[in-house]
A protein has these predicted regions:
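N-terminal cap/lid segment of alpha/beta-hydrolase-fold proteins
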Residues: 1-40, 352-353
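Short, surface-exposed "cap/lid" segments of acyl-processing enzymes
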Residues: 32-65, 69-76
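Catalytic nucleophile-loop/oxyanion-hole region of alpha/beta-hydrolase
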Residues: 48, 73-107, 357
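Primarily recognizes the serine-hydrolase "nucleophile elbow" in alpha/beta-hydrolase
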Residues: 96-99, 105-176
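Alpha/beta-hydrolase-fold enzymes
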Residues: 140-263
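Conserved alpha/beta-hydrolase "acid-adjacent" motif
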Residues: 162-163, 319-325
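Short beta-strand/loop motif that positions the catalytic acidic residue
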Residues: 306, 312-314, 318
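Catalytic histidine-centered segment of alpha/beta-hydrolase-like enzymes
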Residues: 345-357
Length: 372
């Protein structure tokens, strides 16, 4: 095993300047074996989570690879996310690997929510297709992105709109009232105890999609109403986004996951808490990232443009990524050379001990088989 060198990387964005305090909009940490310049390196980016110190970075660096944990300006800044802007800033990181770090082959690592984001990056690089959101200006920088040479999806979600819709509580009757509830759809109420029957599941899923569509209709109407005023956009809240029936009922898509559990613990408590995905958005961010109708953050169409060798690694005890998600990712990939592997662990590969090392071996060996 190698000792590891960690190098902070701060770079300009093609879209915005440095912060007044001096910070670069694009930032990350490059991990590599000490005294060695790898010719193959990974890059991992998420929609809003800080991946600069990604948990796999030291493991893959120990195995001889470079690893750039890369953040766009939307790290910790989810309410303002725009896909085309994020792709341009991922491109800054990929270009740095090739032009400065001396990397010849880039592996795009799409982990967790980053699965659909990195798929969108590769898709745009090989066949430009991403459009500005709701009247935004075209981003020239995404027309000539450097494509990745391999693609890895690790414990990856199927896309932001699907994840939010599958997790959102459709019993909300008033988007301005976090306590409003339709008791006939309340997954935690006495009328609907788990295990849930097929009819309730059908009604529930339909109501989730209907809630997403209602918010999209409202967002489009508000943008239209703001046209010609002093405001170009506005922020709004979204309540109760920890209510996927699979979090509560382990009989739906059985797996190794802990029953009645989500990433924040007890789903009933998390659902009425302050933390969750999509809890605050601008109108344009909703349309760019969360809307089933308008978002381009859905993985499937992007995966259909990915033809480089691809690996999907699924954690079978993941609380909120299910077997059907991994199967769909694998199915939609257009790569002739693709593989689906599983590890018996949670979303972050924390338990049992040694799982991260096992996953790193799996990924490193797969890459080694496909690179000189």
């Amino acid at each position: 095993m190698h000792d590891i060198t960690r190098e902070f990387v701060g770079l300009a964005s093609p879209l915005v300047g440095r912060a007044g305090a001096g910070g670069h909009p694009c930032q990350g940490i490059y991990h590599r074996p000490e005294g060695h310049r790898p010719t193959t390196a990974f890059i991992a980016t998420h929609y809003n989570v800080d991946f600069s110190e990604h948990y796999l970075a030291p493991y893959l660096a120990e195995r001889g690879y470079g690893f750039l944990g890369w953040n766009t300006r939307f790290r910790g800044n989810e309410p303002y996310f725009l896909l085309d802007h994020a792709l341009a800033e991922i491109g800054v990181g990929v270009r740095w690997l090739k032009e400065v770090a001396g990397v010849e082959r880039v592996v795009l690592l799409g982990n967790s929510g980053g699965g659909s984001l990195m798929a969108a990056y590769q898709s745009q690089a090989v066949e430009p297709n991403v459009l500005p959101t709701a009247g935004g200006r075209p981003v020239d920088a995404i027309q000539h992105l450097d494509a990745g040479d391999l693609f890895v999806a690790l414990a990856a979600h199927s896309g932001r709109p699907e994840v939010l819709t599958n997790w959102m509580d459709p019993s909300v009757t008033d988007e301005t009232d976090a306590l409003s509830v339709d008791p006939d759809l309340d997954p935690f109420g006495p009328r609907n105890p788990a295990p849930y029957d097929a009819e309730f599941q059908r009604r529930y899923r339909a109501a989730q999609r209907a809630r997403n569509e209602r918010i999209t209709n409202w967002a489009l109407e508000r943008l239209d109403a703001l046209r010609g005023t002093r405001a170009r956009d506005q922020l709004f809240q979204l309540h109760r986004t920890w209510a996927d029936l699979r979090m509560i009922d382990p009989a739906i898509e059985p797996s190794d996951r802990r029953p009645n559990w989500c990433y924040l613990g007890d789903p009933a408590r998390a659902n009425y808490g302050m933390f969750g995905i999509g809890t605050l958005s601008t109108l344009r961010t909703w349309l760019s990232m969360w809307s089933l109708r308008t978002s381009q953050c859905i993985a499937a169409p992007h995966l259909a443009r990915i033809t480089v060798p691809s690996l999907v690694v699924h954690a079978t005890a993941d609380a909120c990524v299910y077997d059907s998600d991994a199967d769909a990712l694998f199915r939609h990939l257009a790569a002739p050379d693709k593989r689906l592997e599983t590890v018996k662990s949670d979303h972050y590969l924390q338990e049992p001990d040694g799982t991260r090392s096992l996953a790193a071996d799996l990924i490193a060996n797969w890459v080694a088989e496909r690179t000189p």
